[in-house]
Amino acid sequence: MGLFGMMKFAQTHHLVKRRGLRAPEGYFTPIAVDLWNVMYTLVVKYQRRYPSYDREAITLHCLCSMLRVFTQKSLFPIFVTDRGVECTEPVVFGAKAILARTTAQCRTDEEASDVDASPPPSPITDSRPSFAFSNMRRRGHAFAPGDRGTRAAGPGPAAPSGAPSKPALRLAHLFCIRVLRALGYAYINSGQLEADDACANLYHTNTVAYVHTTDTDLLLMGCDIVLDISTGYIPTIHCRDLLQYFKMSYPQFLALFVRCHTDLHPNNTYASVEDVLRECHWTAPSRSQARRAARRERANSRSLESMPTLTAAPVGLETRISWTEILAQQIAGEDDYEEDPPLQPPDVAGGPRDGARSSSSEILTPPELVQVPNAQRVAEHRGYVAGRRRHVIHDAPEALDWLPDPMTIAELVEHRYVKYVISLISPKERGPWTLLKRLPIYQDLRDEDLARSIVTRHITAPDIADRFLAQLWAHAPPPAFYKDVLAKFWDE
């Protein structure tokens, strides 16, 4: 899943940055967690180490490890589920649904040109309660003002714990969801949305700072992603780093790399990131340009470089944008600046040389040894929040100007998906206000008796169950109320 070749490209071109993600003292950093994606990655990693564990045992082992790291790093997870909290919802929105609906409507490319390019409106598009939201509210209750939560649902009848994508995968998804709810963690019931789309909604409504996933299609939706939280410095990819490296605006990025989305192009018909860039005759920045970019990033990591103004192609001259010409115009004159002197390496013992101000985002020593004044962390945090509020993606609809009129099934699928992404992340104008509706967040009351009942019911070996329960009580303390966490992180 994701953009084919994007992860390899990001690693090769040093776009995977390692950051501490340490918020000021007393703050929790909210992070959306694509639960299936993250747990899948952990289970694949650990199931060979513990061949005697069944699905529930290996799932709980991975869950305990993940929750312990969240606690250690002061991260506040908001878990996003696939197919609802009971794993029974049909997914009717998103990339896979758009592909299925389009291929059912059009059997040949000739039919595609006569079909409406608009996808069905997502639940976020309409301001009225949708069918998907109605389902969410029937299964759980959103917090009323002053309410601290609702009692989690009981274990219920014995039900399968979610179908694994491969027979060899030992991931009990429904079991994982029930344990998290019993422990009182915040979650999103994505209902008929894909988890990726719900994560993007949380990011663009300034609910979370990052999305924890390895799916690079979140980058196509303009999000910053965290790949792994278990390391000292957390590997992240920022969408704006990609835009600066490619020297293009977000609408260009969305229109160009939608061709690489694996869920939209079956039977290996997608293009790779390298193929798309090669067709555009894109060239990587020179070393001097990379050094200047690194210097600008360190000087002011909160400022976003203004994107170049582009002129639309004349009407009637061509139906597909000439990306070669556009990118050639954008990189023209980049080498007119004089060569920068090599950057001095930082002083490992004392920080940057020449008395430069130390930044908590710079990687100098292991994070547990970095001593940064809390006042500096607060100032950097406020700058980050101000930057996120200032750099809302308002120009996403311009991506449609860079797409050709759909003449084939593939182009129709891409056109519909781009429109769908725009409906997810672009705020709507309502008089003097710009609004983007956020999916409701739920947080059940913590019930340790219920959690113990769920664990002992599915893990029949008493010694294994007791060991995991002891880990949960030790490393997964009662989480804070999500509204308090979000208010402190974004508003103080």
UniProtKB/Swiss-Prot annotation:
One example GO MF annotation: endonuclease activity
Keyword Hydrolase: yes
GO terms classed as biological process: symbiont-mediated degradation of host mRNA; symbiont-mediated suppression of host gene expression; symbiont-mediated suppression of host innate immune response
UniProt keyword list: Decay of host mRNAs by virus, Endonuclease, Eukaryotic host gene expression shutoff by virus, Host gene expression shutoff by virus, Host mRNA suppression by virus, Host-virus interaction, Hydrolase, Inhibition of host innate immune response by virus, Interferon antiviral system evasion, Late protein, Nuclease, RNA-binding, Viral immunoevasion, Virion
Keyword RNA-binding listed: yes
Intracellular or extracellular location(s): Virion
Site (Necessary for the endonuclease activity): D215
Record-listed E.C. numbers: 3.1.27.-
InterPro entries in alphabetical order: PIN-like_dom_sf (IPR029060), XPG-I_dom (IPR006086)
Residue numbers spanned by region Disordered: 110-130, 143-165, 288-307, 334-369
Bias (Low complexity) ranges: 144-165
GO cellular component, one term: virion component
Record's signal peptide: none
Subunit-level organization: Interacts with human EIF4H, EIF4A1 and EIF4A2; interaction with eIF4AI and EIF4A2 presumably allows Vhs protein to associate with the eIF4F cap-binding complex.
Entry's family note: Belongs to the herpesviridae VHS protein family.
Function statement: Minor structural protein that acts as an endoribonuclease during lytic infection. Degrades host mRNAs in the cytoplasm by cutting them at preferred sites, including some in regions of translation initiation. Together with inhibition of host splicing by ICP27, contributes to an overall decrease in host protein synthesis. Also, after the onset of viral transcription, accelerates the turnover of viral mRNA, thereby facilitating the sequential expression of different classes of viral genes.
Name of the molecule in the record: Virion host shutoff protein
Species of origin: Human herpesvirus 2 (strain HG52)
